[in-house]
């Protein structure tokens, strides 16, 4: 979490109101203190980090908190990841999650729908597929929303955690591609809703740099060699077509260069049958 204590309390209250078995909660403070928040009787634990490790780094700390002693396996079958300024709209969301994972043993990740609490609208960028005009349509997808999702812990056991070095942007797609390559499925569920104020992504220089750098890292880490220049080239063209400002474009190209000249972490190119699978799901890994 960051520095939104009122919103966090509302979120925790909405989690506590969920039907079915109680949900154990871990709140990760990224460079902030969490005084008085831990409540063992209510199943709430806290982890205070001395610095901000970024979105994937902080979530990896939360994942680690659910590992069994010795790091072999987990104390839970499914982990929920919720933004600290969100709110679960319904009381049956956790039960819907349990039902989804129980009924489909190949389901690895569920992406919730994010809706504005005032208007009820879902922003197009919060629908994790190319055909995003109807956010009320649930479907099988190729990625997921980082601030509102559920992941089967066996996915982490098999393919590893989120890429902490990404810090911000595209870490979900990195995990999604690895999960899909391992045979897991990802669903977008319009009936599982996290209320979250509609916002625009930050458009500062750091944002543009990380988006560009992580696009390159994503391709270098996960795509067959033949597709790496195609994927990166398509996103270069799309960026230019959007006509960003001069400072934004300068930051973007700085990140683009950084993506090629710095370590992206381990390279594990997906199988060609996974490329075809992504294509059949409506999002070939070139866009």
Language-model-derived ranges and their functions:
Residues 13-22:
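Short, acidic, metal-binding catalytic loop of nucleotide-sugar glycosyltransferases
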Residues 49-72:
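Glycine-rich, basic loop-to-helix element that forms the pyrophosphate-binding segment
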Residues 71-87:
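Short beta-strand-to-loop acidic/aromatic patch adjacent to the donor-nucleotide binding site
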Residues 87, 91-123:
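Conserved donor NDP-sugar-binding/catalytic core segment of glycosyltransferases
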Residues 116, 133-151, 173, 203:
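A recurrent flexible, glycine/aromatic-enriched loop bordering the glycosyltransferase active site
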Residues 143-151, 155-160, 165-193:
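A short, conserved alpha-helix in the catalytic core of glycosyltransferases
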Residues 182-206, 215-218:
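Active-site donor/metal-binding and catalytic loop motifs
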Residues 210, 225-287:
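Non-catalytic, C-terminal membrane-associated alpha-helical segments of glycosyltransferases
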